[in-house]
A protein has these predicted regions:
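Residues that flank catalytic or metal-binding motifs in active/ligand-binding sites
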Residues: 4, 41, 48-50, 63-67
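Vicinal oxygen chelate
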Residues: 13-16, 67-115, 120
Length: 134
């Protein structure tokens, strides 16, 4: 069976400005871009197996994206990795905040209002591990 690969689209006002944010603030790279008349209209950004498409082609959809990004690690390692990610992103000036959707989230809003949710599935919204009784 063939593995599937998804690349969700985030709709943005200005792809070049969004590329600067995703690369400079969030640590992504950009393997390709589609340009027309000297302007970038679509680009892919990647980081550690996570691929997203940035596009300015549907203005009515700008800022309405929501992506859940999960780390494929054991729970303790995942918590440590997300805490390290938060420290890294805050050092670049990325707008990082706490969130909750039944469990703790690390939330980043891009310049257009699209949201990236990095989840801590091994913890409840209170910050306690699922098996923690204290």
């Amino acid at each position: 069976m063939t593995d599937w690969f998804a690349r969700p689209v985030l709709h943005v006002t200005n792809v070049e400005a969004s590329l600067r944010f995703y690369i400079d603030r969030l640590g992504f790279t950009s393997p390709w871009r589609y340009e027309e008349d000297g302007k970038v209209h679509v680009a892919q950004v990647e980081r550690q197996g996570c691929a997203l498409i940035l596009a300015d082609t549907w203005p009515e959809k700008i800022g309405k994206g929501l992506m859940f990004i999960s780390l494929n690690l054991e729970p303790a390692a995942q918590v440590a990795a997300l805490n390290a990610l938060r420290t890294e992103l805050e050092a670049t000036g990325a707008p990082v905040k706490e969130g909750s959707w039944g469990y703790r989230l690390l939330v980043v809003d891009d310049p257009d209002g699209n949201q990236l949710f990095f989840n801590y599935p091994s913890e409840s919204a209170s910050g306690k591990s699922d098996g923690d009784e204290t």
